[in-house]
Regions:
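Non-catalytic interaction-recognition regions
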Residues: 2-105, 116, 120-562
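Short, charged, solvent-exposed linker or helix-capping segments at domain edges/interfaces
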Residues: 106-111
Length: 562
């Protein structure tokens, strides 16, 4: 939380405890051990700027009704030397505290002093956390679910970083197993269809996308029909060796264009090459957590909350995808991460329990793995669902989206709804350059402040640091409401980190822009007496700082003019 908010909470606790002790000494309250109580910021500011349940929390200790306890506390309450100018009781014993100008002055001073660091905290205590997200199969182009996952994962990682975690972003490339076998088969058949008189047909469960045909044609253009004269195994190996790196390179290019920068692209094939997949089987076997049946190696998943035991190694000697997944998560812990966050599509919900159970099986706590399930995306145009790209006539891919929609809009709009909610992405809204587009609305607030500052500087007015007395001139409801919102930014970051919910920050900054526009329409800056003008300029600069910090954190551009 911001320093001023932290001080205010501490002051409420201190004056309540002092008043209780004073009331006990005066015989107004019986002698008792002081109880624990909470100090919160009410959602409804008519209930005060801070509120405490101290009277209700101490009812059992004092054996008195909360309203009587509250009355005794109020009679002995001393607010001198605090941020607060008054306190009052409400309801069944709540005590509400109202802030004075010193708090508002300190908030603005703190924002301008900390500048780009405002909002950051040590809440995470530098714990090492890995956020693994997108992790799309490299067998085809990335889709809208990957677009949402990219924005969600990257912005969540940034929120965690701001909250004091040591964050690592990772993309797990599934370049092994059944999906890759299917990829090789599909490429081989498409390649043969270019040259053979009676080529094989694609099986129903193979990849039918045009991207597969495009890769086959590209190989044929470079190498001709040379693979028609080799074995099927050699043909598949050559085509996978040609197509897979191209697909991975395209995925990396799309993510870079999307402003998603990973610390590592981790290849599943490396787990197999390094022997880590079979090593995890041996690890579980040594712990007595496997058995053999029908020639396969089984893991006793039911001992860790699973509905059924799971195959680790098939009868043909090949490990399952689940085995590789366990090995990958063990690898993460072996690299020293304290907390793992995976973002999966909601269609993987059935795998959550068995994956968390496997964490216990490898000697870790299931609580160290958090899995966020993300709902699907529906693209909308003219109020109707749309699946095909206007430009290509094919299914819309991430690359297509980024060609049509500004990256700023995509990153912001994909974080407008919580992960567990279906999201309608409005393609028309995303390209609008007006206040209907939420990211434009927020960016415009920042640009408007920059415009105000430029206009005044052109007239010879230079913003300066204000005294507490000058900042005390900010008394209009719109001014105080805006400062209160600015003061809550650090708490919002911490809350978003706790809940794994960057959407909370998206909503926060939209509301900040709304409160700024409301302030600007109600309170003149230019033309006021110099001290008041400078105080309002300070409020403008503080608002711009917070907007800039949010947009920068989300890797969205921060325009100074629009």
């Amino acid at each position: 939380m911001s320093k001023a908010v932290s001080i205010a909470k501490e002051q409420v606790s201190a004056v309540i405890e002092a008043a209780m002790k004073k009331a006990m000494a005066a015989g107004m309250l019986p002698e008792a051990e002081l109880p624990a109580f909470t100090v919160e910021r009410p959602a409804d500011r008519s209930h005060g700027d801070f509120a405490t349940n101290a009277a209700m929390a101490s009812a059992r200790a004092f054996r008195m009704a909360p309203p009587k306890i509250a009355a005794a506390i109020m009679e002995n309450l001393d607010l001198n030397g605090t941020y607060f100018v008054k306190a009052e009781t409400a309801g069944p014993g709540f005590m509400n505290f109202f802030l004075g100008s010193a708090f508002y002055s300190d908030v603005l001073t703190e924002v301008l002093t900390k500048d780009s660091a405002y909002g950051r905290s040590d809440y995470g205590n530098h714990r090492k956390v890995m956020v693994e997200f997108v992790s799309a199969n490299p067998t085809g182009p990335m889709h809208m679910g990957n677009a949402r996952g990219g924005a969600l994962g990257d912005c969540l990682a940034s929120v965690l970083d701001a909250a004091g975690y040591d964050v690592w972003r990772e993309f797990y490339v599934n370049d092994a197993g059944n999906q890759l076998d299917k990829f090789g088969l599909s490429l081989s058949i498409r390649y043969q269809q270019l040259f053979a008189e009676n080529p094989p047909e694609l099986p129903e469960d193979s990849y039918h996308g045009e991207d597969i045909l495009d890769l086959a044609k590209e190989y044929a253009k470079e190498h001709g029909d040379e693979l028609m004269h080799v074995t099927e195994e050699e043909r598949r190996k050559a085509l996978v060796g040609f197509g897979l790196p191209k697909n991975i390179a395209k995925m990396k290019a799309d993510m870079e264009k999307y402003r998603v920068h990973y610390d590592r692209w981790f290849l599943e094939s490396d787990l197999h090459k390094d022997g880590e997949v079979m090593a995890v089987v041996d690890y579980l076997r040594d712990r007595g957590l496997t058995y053999e049946k029908d020639g396969a190696v089984w893991y006793k998943a039911t001992e860790f909350g699973g509905e059924k035991d799971e195959v680790l190694v098939r009868a043909n000697g090949n490990p399952t995808y689940f085995t590789a997944d366990i090995a990958y998560h063990k690898n993460k812990f072996d690299r020293g991460f304290d907390l793992l966050i995976d973002i999966w599509g909601s269609d993987h919900h059935g795998h959550v329990a068995r994956m968390k159970g496997a964490m216990n099986a490898i000697g870790q706590s299931a609580d160290k793995l958090d899995i966020i399930l993300m709902q699907f995306v529906r693209l909308m145009r003219d109020g109707q669902p749309v699946r095909m790209s206007k430009r290509t006539g094919k299914a819309i891919q991430l690359g297509d989206l980024l060609d049509e929609v500004p990256v700023d809009s995509a990153r912001f709009l994909f974080n407008m709804r919580e992960a567990n909610s279906l999201l309608d992405f409005d393609l028309d809204l995303a390209v609008q350059q007006d206040s209907q587009n939420p990211v434009y609305y927020v960016q415009y607030a920042h640009a408007r402040i920059c415009s105000i500052l430029r206009a005044l500087e052109a007239e010879g007015v230079t913003p300066r640091n204000c005294t507490a007395e000058e900042l005390a001139l900010l008394t209009a409801p719109e001014e105080l409401e805006l400062i209160q919102h600015i003061a809550s930014y650090t708490d919002e970051i911490i809350g978003a980190a706790k809940d794994y919910d960057p959407v909370r920050i998206t909503r926060y900054v939209i509301e900040l822009a709304t409160k700024f526009h409301k302030f600007y329409n109600a309170c003149r800056v230019k033309g006021e007496e110099e001290s008041l003008m400078q105080a309002r300029l300070t409020l403008c600069r503080a608002t711009a700082t917070v907007i800039r910090n949010v947009l920068t954190m989300f890797n969205i551009t921060v325009p100074t003019s629009m």
